[in-house]
C-alpha cells in the first residue's frame, strides 16, 4: 500500500483523486489546497477515509507520504515542486512543468539523473490508442510527417487568461511528438497565432523540422461554439511515411491505416474497469499505476515524461510563443 498526497484540488486534482479511489493499492493520506471550497469538495469525496486536509503544504510535509501529485496552477508548480523535492519527496507533476523553461531549469539540482523523483503528468503517453500507434510504427519505415489538431471551445480563451493554445493544449501534441522522434531536437521552428479582438489568443499554428527531414505541423484553437456538442472537439494525430499513413482519432477506439492504397481499421479495446468510462480516464488510471510502480522501483520514467524532456518541451513552447508574437 502506497500513501499519496494531492496538492491542488481543482478540476485535474479531483480527476486524479477519483481514479485513485478506485485503486486498491493506494491511500490518499493528504489533500492540500489554499481554496477552502476546493478542500470542502475533497472532504466530501474522502468522507469515509482517513485523509488529512490542509490549506498549506508545509503543515503536512512531515506526514511521510510515499509520493505527491501536484495538480495546482502552473504558476505555483516550481515553488511547490521545489518544496517537496527539498523534503525528499517524489512527484507526479501535471503539465506544463512551468510558465517558462528558465523557471523549470531551476529545479535541476534537485532532480535525480533518471528523473525518478519527478515524473511529468503527460497523460497521452499512457493513452491506449497512442500506445497502439507506437507499436504499429515499429513495423513501418521512417516517419516523414506528423500532423496534429486539437480544437477546443471558444470559452477556453476567457477561462484560462494568460494561457495560449501553445501552452494549454498544444503541449499534449508536443510531448507526444517528442516521444515519437525519440527526443530529437528540431533544427527549425516556426509559429503563427491569431489574437482575438477581445484579448488573448484563440488560434495557434506551429511547424517543426528535424535534421533527418521529419516535418510536424500542429494546430490548436479555441473556435468551437460554446454550446456545441461535446464530441465536436476532435483531437487527431496523423503519422505519414513512404507509402503509408496512420491516423489516430483520440477516444474513438481505432487507428485508421493507409498502406499502399489499402485502408484498414485497427480496433483498440477499452477494458472494463470501475471508474473508467472513456479512454482519457483510462489513460489517467494507467499513468497513476505507472507512478505507483515507479514508487515501488518496478519501472522507469518513460521518454517524454522525464524532467529533462519537460524542460526541452518547455523550451519549444517558449520559442513558439515568441515566434508567433514576432519577438524572435
Q: Can you describe what each PLM-predicted range is?
A:
Residues 1-48:
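N-terminal Rossmann-like dinucleotide-binding module
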Residues 16, 46-108:
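Beta-loop-alpha module in the N-terminal Rossmann-like domain of NAD(P)-dependent dehydrogenases
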Residues 26, 59, 67-70, 116, ...:
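C-terminal helix-rich "cap/oligomerization" subdomain common to oxidoreductases
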Residues 93, 118-120, 248:
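Hydrophobic residues in well-ordered beta-strands that form the structural core
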Residues 98-157:
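A contiguous active-site-proximal alpha/beta segment in oxidoreductase catalytic domains
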Residues 121-128, 154-186, 200-202:
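Mid-domain beta-loop-alpha active-site segment that forms a flexible
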Residues 123, 234-308, 328:
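C-terminal glycine/acidic-rich active-site capping loop/insertion
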Residues 172-254, 283, 288-295:
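Contiguous beta-strand/loop segments that form the cofactor/metal-binding neighborhood of enzyme cores
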Amino acid at each position: 500500500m502506497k500513501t499519496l498526497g494531492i496538492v491542488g484540488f481543482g478540476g485535474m486534482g479531483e480527476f486524479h483523486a477519483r481514479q485513485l479511489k478506485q485503486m486498491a493499492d493506494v491511500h490518499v493520506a493528504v489533500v492540500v489546497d489554499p481554496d477552502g471550497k476546493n478542500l470542502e469538495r475533497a472532504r466530501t469525496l474522502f468522507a469515509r477515509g482517513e485523509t488529512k486536509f490542509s490549506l498549506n503544504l508545509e503543515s503536512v510535509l512531515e506526514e511521510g507520504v510515499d509520493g505527491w501529485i501536484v495538480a495546482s496552477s502552473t504558476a505555483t508548480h516550481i515553488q511547490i515542486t521545489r518544496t517537496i523535492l527539498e523534503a525528499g519527496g517524489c512527484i507526479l507533476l501535471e503539465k506544463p512543468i512551468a510558465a517558462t523553461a528558465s523557471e523549470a531549469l531551476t529545479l535541476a539540482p534537485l532532480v535525480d539523473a533518471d528523473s525518478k523523483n519527478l515524473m511529468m503528468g503527460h497523460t497521452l503517453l499512457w493513452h491506449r490508442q497512442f500506445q497502439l500507434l507506437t507499436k504499429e510504427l515499429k513495423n513501418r519505415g521512417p516517419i516523414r510527417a506528423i500532423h496534429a489538431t486539437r480544437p477546443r471551445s471558444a470559452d477556453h480563451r476567457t477561462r484560462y487568461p494568460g494561457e495560449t493554445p501553445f501552452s494549454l493544449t498544444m503541449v499534449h501534441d508536443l510531448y507526444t511528438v517528442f516521444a515519437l522522434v525519440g527526443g530529437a531536437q528540431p533544427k527549425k521552428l516556426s509559429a503563427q497565432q491569431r489574437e482575438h479582438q477581445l484579448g488573448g489568443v484563440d488560434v495557434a499554428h506551429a511547424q517543426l523540422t528535424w535534421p533527418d527531414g521529419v516535418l510536424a505541423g500542429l494546430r490548436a484553437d479555441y473556435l468551437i461554439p460554446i454550446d456545441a456538442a461535446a464530441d465536436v472537439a476532435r483531437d487527431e494525430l496523423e503519422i505519414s511515411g513512404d507509402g503509408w499513413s496512420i491516423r489516430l482519432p483520440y477516444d474513438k477506439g481505432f487507428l485508421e491505416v493507409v498502406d499502399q492504397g489499402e485502408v484498414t481499421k485497427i480496433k483498440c479495446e477499452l477494458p472494463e474497469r470501475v471508474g473508467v468510462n472513456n479512454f482519457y480516464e483510462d489513460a489517467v488510471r494507467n499513468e497513476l499505476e505507472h507512478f505507483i510502480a515507479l514508487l515501488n522501483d518496478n519501472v522507469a520514467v518513460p521518454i517524454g515524461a522525464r524532467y529533462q524532456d519537460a524542460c526541452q518541451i518547455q523550451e519549444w513552447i517558449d520559442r513558439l510563443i515568441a515566434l508567433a508574437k514576432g519577438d524572435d
